Amino acid sequence: MDTATPSAEAILRTAAGRARAAMRSLAAMPAARRDGALRAAAAELRIHAVNILAANARDLDSFEGPPAMRDRLLLNEARIEAIAAGIDAIADLPDPLAGSLAEWTRPNGLVIRRVPQPLGVIGMIYESRPNVGADAAAICIKSGNAVILRGGSESYHSNTAIYLAMTKGLRQAGFPDGTVQIAPNIDRAFVAAMLGASGQIDLIIPRGGKSLVERVQREARVPVLAHAEGLNHTYIHAEADAEMARTVLANAKMRRTGICGATETLLIDAAIAPALLPRLIEDLAALGCGFRADDRARAIVPSLPAAGPADFDTEWLDAMLSVSVVDDLDAALDHIARHGSSHTEAIVTENADAAARFLAGTDSAVAMWNASTQFCDGGEFGFGAEIGIATGRIHARGPIGPAQLTTFRYHVVGTGQVRP
């Protein structure tokens, strides 16, 4: 009797086959049934909150990373409720598979409709945050996709507990077992198997640190929807409202320092810097923020530590802010072009023309005017949650919700036409 442990490739092939079968059912399923299953999954998360917290405690006990990463890993009752509420919100969204995207009639009478369609089988590779698996599963179900999850080893017990609770709800709703699956262990070979699963997985979405995303992009034989680091800037224009600038910047940097939507660099116009920069520094220092500043900023606030060569290319994910004084809007745009990651950029100004130039001049997935960069979030965009923030140009950009996990095809309706 052969008792050999199946290889990662064999496990992945089995999972992908089950996912493909489930996806075919999901694509044809009425929206009300998909939404009902999501609500059942959310209910089970609430019911099993104690088990999820116990699993999370096991992960936290063995975690040895920095405080910012520990905060990403941490679950509590409020965060579990937020996950469940996000799933309920996804269920309440319009059906991304409903209706036609476009329709037209050709001179020969053929009616052509462009209709939405699920992408297929999604592979989700993520680190640290246990909520990512729940969000990804919910967004995939809403959009008619099946998903295979592979979370980080540091959150293995939390991820598994969330998966078990959600799939209990899905089974109660009569969903195929292959709808949502999770890697059965923390074997890194499973990641390699996912990346090489051309023809089995239709899209890989990495969500995590720069090294993870770069590895996926480098090794994948499957299309990748990349989520780059958040080297986000808040630019205080010469015509900014000072009190608004103070409020927006404090939130953009310090609300949650460990998320990809946090501001990592302050750019401030030289015309307003002498009066406003000391107040901004004082506000942030009182909240526990540290700084790395260029020479022009240090000339105004001498106590600021000097920035090193790499500091303006660093995603801090912590209570640290790079600071630069720039000549004007053009200089700010130039700085962003050299150091940004195409994630989120914000301007604070009362000048509508300057704001319009900034919004058009930044090559970021999200550009903001008089708002905190931390609004770059699927929930805040009305998507219920997000599966990531796409910073590339294909297939979608910005927060990825259910509608962004669809493609389209064509339905052609005739009355017996033949082509001459």
UniProtKB/Swiss-Prot annotation:
Keyword Endoplasmic reticulum included in the entry's annotation: no
Pathway: Amino-acid biosynthesis; L-proline biosynthesis; L-glutamate 5-semialdehyde from L-glutamate: step 2/2
Primary localisation category: cytoplasm
Key word Cytoplasm present: yes
Family matches, as Gene3D superfamilies: Aldehyde Dehydrogenase, Chain A, domain 1, Aldehyde Dehydrogenase, Chain A, domain 2
Family: Belongs to the gamma-glutamyl phosphate reductase family.
HAMAP family in alphabetical order: ProA
Record's protein name: Gamma-glutamyl phosphate reductase
Lineage of source species: Bacteria, Pseudomonadati, Pseudomonadota, Alphaproteobacteria, Acetobacterales
Gene name tied to this protein: proA
